[in-house]
From Swiss-Prot:
The lineage of its organism: Eukaryota, Metazoa, Chordata, Craniata, Vertebrata. It comes from Xenopus laevis. GO terms for molecular function: amino acid transmembrane transporter activity; arginine binding; cholesterol binding; guanyl-nucleotide exchange factor activity; L-amino acid transmembrane transporter activity; L-arginine transmembrane transporter activity; L-asparagine transmembrane transporter activity; L-glutamine transmembrane transporter activity. A motif (CRAC motif) lies at residues 450-456. This is Neutral amino acid transporter 9. One of its GO terms (biological process) is cellular response to amino acid stimulus.
Length: 554
C-alpha cells in the first residue's frame, strides 16, 4: 500500500520530458496532457501529486478525442473550450500522477548571469548622476565608507525581503509579492501603507525624471541653436583652462540658479528672443507636457518596454565619459580633516545624511526583487546572484562617484562646485556631454510612461479594482502626476534633494522597517527570537527613521 502512494514519475525523467513537451511549436500537440487544475488533489512544487478519479476521467475524455478521426483519416483534437488556460497546464501520467508546469518555465527561465544583469540594470538609475555630489556632501573618505556600508545594509534588508515569503507556514506564497507579505503580517494597514510608500518611490522617480528631462532638453536645444546659428560663447562662469572645460555654474550657492550665466556674441535680438522662449525652468518643463502627457494614456506599456536596453547603453556611455574625462583632467585630491578648505572639502562632514538618503534610493529594489528572482533558473542561487548584483551596483557607484570627485579640477575650481547632476559641470557646448544628454533624454522619455503605468496600476487598481476605470480617471491621474513634475522643475529643480527625500521616505518602509519587523515577528511565532536579533533589527529600524528625519535638517 505504501508503494501505491508514491509518485509514479521519476522527477529527473519528468523534467526532461516536460522540457521537450513544452518546446513543441504546435500547442495542439500537447492537448492530451491537459487536465483541469481543480481536479488536482494538492499543489506542491517539490514532487508529483496523486490525482483524483475526476482527473483520470478528464484525461480519458481528452484521449477520446484523439481516438476519433475524419473519414479522410485525419485525427481529431480536443476543442479549445475543453482546454484550461495556458498558465494552468498539468502534465498527466495515466499511471496516476500529475504535475503542474508553467508553460514559460521550460523556455523563459533565466540563467544566473542574466538574472544578475537584470538586477544591475534595474537598480542603475538617475541616482548615479548625484553620487559625486553626495560624496562631496559627506567628505571623500566618509562618502566612500558610507557607500560600502549602505550597500551592505540594503543588501541584508533585500535578503530579508527575498526570504519573507518562506516565513509564512501552510500557505502557497509562490505568486506573492512583498506587499502581499506585508498584508499578511500587518493586515489592511500593511497593504495601504505599502501602497503609499510605493507611490512615494514611483512619483518621486517621475519628478526626478521630469527635472532631468527639462535639464537635458534645455541643454540640447541650446547646443543645437548655437551650432546652427554659429553663436560664439564666452563663459562668464568659473571654469578651468584647457580643452576639457569644467565649469562651476553656482559658485556661491548649493542649489541651481534659474538663469543663464553665459555671454553670447551674435545676433542679439534673435538670441534674446530664443532665451525668452527657451528657459530651463520657465518654459522647457511646460514643453515636455505636450510630448509626454499623451504617452501616459497608453493602455499597455509594452511598446516602451522594448527600449529598456537604452538604460544599459546610457550607463555604459556615462562610465566611458567619466573615464575619458578623468584621463584628460587627472586626479586632484588632498586629504585633510580640517573644516576650513579653499579648494577641497574635509574628509568628514556633518551633512553626510544627504548621501545616505540618495543611496537608499540608489540601492532600492526591494519592492520588485521577488519578481526579478522568480524567473531565475536555479532558485538555490537567488541569494548568491542577489549579492553579486549588489556588488556590481556598488562598484559602479563607487567608480563613478570617486572618479568624478577625484578628477574635478581643484584648483582652480573648488570641490564645492560639484553639481547635484554632475553633467551640469560640463558646458552645453561639450560634445561628449551633449551625446550623454541625448542618450539620457531619449531613455527617460521611454521610461517615464512605464513609471506612469505602474502608478496607474497600483493606485487605480487598489482604489477601483480596475487599472483603466475610465478615460477621465486616467486623464485626471496623469494630469496630477505631470503637474507635480512641472511644479518641481519650475520651483525646486534640485534632483539631489528630491532623490534623498524620496529615497529616505520609501526606504523607511521597504528597506528598513518592514523587512526587519517581519523577520522578528516570524522568529517570535516560531519561538526563536533572541535578544541579539532584536538589537540588530531594532537598530536597523532606528537607522531608517533617523535617515528620514535627518533629511529635514540638511
Amino acid at each position: 500500500m505504501d508503494s501505491d502512494q508514491t509518485p509514479l514519475i521519476n522527477p529527473s525523467l519528468f523534467e526532461e520530458c516536460a522540457q521537450n513537451h513544452f518546446a513543441a511549436a504546435d500547442s495542439r500537440s500537447r492537448r492530451p496532457f491537459h487536465i483541469e487544475p481543480s481536479y488536482i488533489t494538492s499543489i506542491n512544487d517539490d514532487e508529483p501529486q496523486r490525482i483524483t478519479s475526476e482527473a483520470s476521467a478528464m484525461n480519458k475524455r481528452i484521449h477520446y478525442y484523439s481516438k476519433l478521426s475524419y473519414p479522410s483519416g485525419g485525427g481529431l483534437i480536443a476543442p479549445d473550450h475543453v482546454l484550461p488556460a495556458p498558465e494552468e497546464i498539468y502534465v498527466y501520467s495515466p499511471l496516476g500522477t500529475a504535475l503542474k508546469i508553467d508553460g514559460s518555465d521550460g523556455s523563459e527561465k533565466n540563467s544566473s548571469i542574466v538574472t544578475i544583469f537584470m538586477i544591475w540594470n534595474t537598480m542603475m538609475g538617475t541616482s548615479i548622476l548625484s553620487i559625486p555630489w553626495g560624496i562631496k556632501q559627506a567628505g571623500f573618505t566618509t562618502g566612500v565608507c558610507v557607500l560600502f556600508l549602505m550597500g551592505i545594509l540594503t543588501l541584508y534588508c533585500c535578503y530579508r525581503v527575498v526570504k519573507s515569503r518562506g516565513t509564512i507556514p501552510l500557505t502557497d506564497t509562490s505568486t506573492w509579492e512583498f506587499p502581499d507579505v506585508c498584508q499578511y503580517y500587518f493586515g489592511s494597514f500593511g497593504r495601504w501603507s505599502s501602497l503609499l510608500f510605493s507611490m512615494v518611490s514611483l512619483i518621486g522617480a517621475m519628478i526626478v525624471y521630469w527635472v532631468l528631462m527639462s535639464n537635458f532638453l534645455f541643454n540640447t536645444g541650446k547646443f543645437i541653436y548655437n551650432y546652427v546659428n554659429d553663436v560664439n560663447i564666452t563663459d562668464d562662469v568659473l571654469s578651468n583652462n584647457g580643452t576639457d572645460k569644467v565649469i562651476c555654474p553656482n559658485p556661491d550657492s548649493t542649489g541651481p540658479l534659474n538663469k543663464s550665466m553665459d555671454t553670447y556674441y551674435g545676433n542679439g535680438t534673435n538670441l534674446e528672443h530664443f532665451e525668452t522662449w527657451w528657459s530651463k525652468t520657465n518654459t522647457v518643463p511646460f514643453y515636455l507636457v505636450v510630448l509626454l502627457l499623451p504617452l501616459l494614456g497608453f493602455r499597455s506599456p509594452s511598446f516602451f518596454a522594448k527600449f529598456n536596453i537604452l538604460g544599459t547603453v546610457s550607463i555604459i556611455y556615462l562610465v566611458s565619459l567619466v573615464t575619458l574625462k578623468a584621463a584628460h583632467l587627472g586626479f586632484h585630491l588632498q586629504f585633510s580633516w580640517n573644516q576650513v578648505q579653499t579648494f577641497f572639502v574635509p574628509e568628514f562632514r556633518v551633512s553626510f545624511p544627504q548621501l545616505t538618503g540618495i543611496l537608499t534610493l540608489a540601492f532600492f529594489i526591494h519592492n520588485c526583487i521577488i519578481t526579478l528572482l522568480k524567473n531565475n533558473r536555479n532558485q538555490k542561487n537567488n541569494v548568491r546572484d542577489l549579492s553579486i548584483a549588489y556588488l556590481l551596483v556598488g562598484l559602479t557607484y563607487v567608480y563613478v562617484g570617486v572618479v568624478v570627485f577625484a578628477s574635478f579640477p581643484s584648483p582652480p575650481l573648488s570641490k564645492q562646485c560639484i553639481e547635484q547632476n554632475f553633467l551640469d559641470n560640463f558646458p552645453s557646448s561639450d560634445i561628449l556631454a551633449f551625446v550623454a544628454r541625448i542618450f539620457l533624454l531619449f531613455q527617460m522619455m521611454t521610461v517615464y510612461p512605464l513609471l506612469g503605468y505602474l502608478v496607474r496600476v497600483q493606485l487605480l487598481g487598489h482604489i477601483f479594482g480596475d487599472i483603466y476605470p475610465s478615460i477621465f480617471h486616467v486623464l485626471a491621474l496623469n494630469i496630477a502626476v505631470v503637474g507635480v513634475g512641472v511644479i518641481m522643475a519650475r520651483f525646486y529643480p534640485n534632483i539631489g534633494g528630491i532623490i534623498r527625500f524620496s529615497g529616505a521616505a520609501c526606504g523607511l518602509a521597504f528597506v528598513f522597517v518592514y523587512p526587519s519587523l517581519i523577520h522578528m515577528i516570524s522568529l517570535h511565532r516560531r519561538g526563536q527570537l533572541r535578544i541579539h536579533s532584536i538589537l540588530i533589527h531594532v537598530s536597523i529600524i532606528v537607522l531608517g527613521i533617523s535617515n528620514l528625519i535627518a533629511q529635514f535638517f540638511m
